[in-house]
Design a protein with these regions (language model features):
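Acidic/histidine-rich helix-loop elements
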Residues: 7-22, 119-150
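Active-site flanking residues adjacent to catalytic metal/cofactor-binding acidic residues
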Residues: 8, 42, 113, 176-177
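Active-site environment of divalent metal-dependent phosphoester hydrolases
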Residues: 12-16, 45-49, 65-68, 93, ...
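Metal-dependent phosphoester-hydrolase catalytic domains
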Residues: 84-85, 160-172, 178-240
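A long, amphipathic alpha-helix that forms part
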Residues: 144-170
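N-terminal, active-site-proximal structural segment of metallo-dependent hydrolase catalytic domains
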Residues: 1-52, 158
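Structured beta-strand-rich core segments of catalytic domains in phosphoester-bond hydrolases
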Residues: 1, 38-125, 227, 232-237
């Protein structure tokens, strides 16, 4: 059987107007039009749930210990087990949730992941895309120091997620915003022997982060029992 899986960091549905004139209904309509069988979304407020999408089953998890943001796994198929991955019993700074989903007579486990953000400022992104020779030393130090701290956080999160995945009784599909590149430790640790849907059936460079063109930080990975036939990244700007 064929199932359609969609992963999207909706950036709290543009609640603070980062993208001028973009209304949350536009994002809803896009998700509704895509009509995925399994939808994983990151970064949204609970009040902005999307019941009009008519997904019968969902799992909503709080995104971090302190954050008011949440993430969710919506599906057209029954979810029989839902939980949050923890580190030594504690929630991560960011979150990984999972649902066990019955599709016909088979059960799969779907993980939705959002690893630690780099917390770059707009000035950091500007420097990355437009390096200033006169200020390059200070700017590089600022960017590198942030990356060192969050790189370590993502590594710890990735280790916990991989440990949890190793004990899954079902074949897995992993969706999410890793905030890191395919060369990173976090990506490689989580991926393990899974296949990458972009690598298997995508085209182009697969960039997924508007602020740094050509950067891929969002992924759909899957067990080798599955096959990716049509990876697609829409060229729309409804989030970052």
């Amino acid at each position: 059987d064929t199932i359609k899986v969609l992963s999207y960091n909706v950036r709290i549905f543009n609640a603070y107007g980062w993208i001028p004139q973009l209304k949350k209904e536009t994002i809803y309509n896009y998700l509704k039009k895509e009509n995925a069988d399994i939808l994983c979304i990151q970064e949204f407020y609970v009040k902005d749930e999307i019941p009009e999408m008519n997904y019968k089953y969902h799992h909503i998890g709080k995104q971090s210990k302190k954050s008011k943001w949440h993430m969710a796994i919506y599906s057209k198929y029954k979810q029989i087990n839902k939980a949050t991955v923890t580190i030594n019993g504690e929630k991560m700074n960011n979150t990984c949730i999972f649902s066990d989903i019955i599709i016909n007579n088979d059960t799969i486990r779907v993980y939705n992941i959002h690893l630690a953000s780099n917390w770059f400022k707009e000035s950091d992104y500007y420097f990355i895309n437009n390096p200033n020779k006169e200020k390059i030393y200070n700017n590089i130090n600022a960017v590198v120091n942030k990356m060192k701290k969050t790189y370590k956080s993502r590594a710890i999160e990735a280790l916990a997620i991989r440990k949890h995945m190793n004990n899954s009784p079902y074949p897995v599909i992993v969706c999410g915003d890793f905030n890191d590149t395919p060369m990173s430790y976090a990506y490689k640790k989580i991926k393990g022997n899974l296949d990458d849907s972009f690598s298997k059936s995508g085209q182009g460079i697969g960039s997924s982060f508007v602020k740094i063109p050509a950067l891929r930080i969002d992924y759909i990975l899957y067990d080798k029992k599955f096959k990716s036939t049509n990876y697609k990244k829409d060229n729309i700007i409804l989030s970052d």
